[in-house]
C-alpha cells in the first residue's frame, strides 16, 4: 500500500514539476522576446543606454541575436566607445552559435582586417559562406550583399585556399 501511495505521489510530483518547468520556460521566452523588442525600440529611438542595458545581460547569457546587436553598437560606437575588437569578439561568439547576421559581420571583418588583425580571406570566405546558407527570405538583401562580398574575397584566394575554405564550410558545426 505504501509503495502504491509513493508511486502515485512520485507521479503527481513529476507532473507538477513538468508543468512548473513548462510555465517557467514559456514565461522566460516571453520575457526574452519582450526584452529584445524593448531594446530594438530603444535602439531605433536612439536611446542607446536603454538598448545597452537590455541587450548586454542577454548577450552575457549567450543570446546570439543580442550579442550581434551589441556588437553592432560597439562597431558604430553607439552608446559605447567605438571598439572594433569588442565588436569582433561579440560577432564571433554569435557566429559560432550559427547566427547568420553575425557570421556575415565577422566574415566582413576578416575580409577587410577590421578589428581582427590580420586580414584573413580564408576565414572571411568561410563565415560569409555560412551566412549565405543561413540567411532567410526575410534577409534577402543581406544575402545578396553577402554573395557579392564572398565573390570579392574569393577573387583573392588561390584555388587551394578556396578548396580549404569550402571544406571548412562543410565541416563547420555550431557551438552551443
Where do the model's predicted regions map?
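Short helix-capping/linker turns of helical repeat alpha-solenoids
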Residues: 30, 42-47, 60-63, 76-78, ...
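Terminal, low-structured helical/coil segments at or just beyond the last alpha-helical repeat
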Residues: 32, 141-176
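Bacterial N-terminal signal peptides
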Residues: 13-23
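Bacterial N-terminal signal peptides that target proteins for export
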Residues: 2-14
Amino acid at each position: 500500500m505504501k509503495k502504491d501511495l509513493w508511486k502515485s505521489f512520485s507521479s503527481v510530483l513529476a507532473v507538477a514539476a513538468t508543468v512548473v518547468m513548462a510555465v517557467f520556460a514559456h514565461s522566460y521566452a516571453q520575457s526574452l522576446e519582450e526584452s529584445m523588442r524593448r531594446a530594438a525600440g530603444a535602439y531605433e529611438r536612439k536611446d542607446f543606454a536603454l538598448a545597452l542595458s537590455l541587450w548586454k545581460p542577454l548577450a552575457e547569457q549567450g543570446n546570439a541575436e543580442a550579442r550581434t546587436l551589441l556588437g553592432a553598437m560597439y562597431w558604430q560606437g553607439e552608446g559605447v566607445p567605438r571598439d572594433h575588437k569588442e565588436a569582433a569578439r561579440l560577432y564571433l561568439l554569435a557566429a559560432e552559435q550559427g547566427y547568420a547576421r553575425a557570421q556575415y559581420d565577422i566574415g566582413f571583418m576578416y575580409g577587410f582586417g577590421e578589428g581582427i588583425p590580420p586580414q584573413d580571406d580564408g576565414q572571411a570566405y568561410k563565415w560569409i559562406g555560412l551566412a549565405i546558407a543561413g540567411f532567410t527570405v526575410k534577409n534577402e538583401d543581406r544575402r545578396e550583399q553577402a554573395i557579392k562580398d564572398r565573390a570579392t574575397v574569393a577573387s583573392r584566394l588561390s584555388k587551394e585556399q578556396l578548396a580549404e575554405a569550402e571544406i571548412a564550410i562543410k565541416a563547420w558545426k555550431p557551438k552551443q
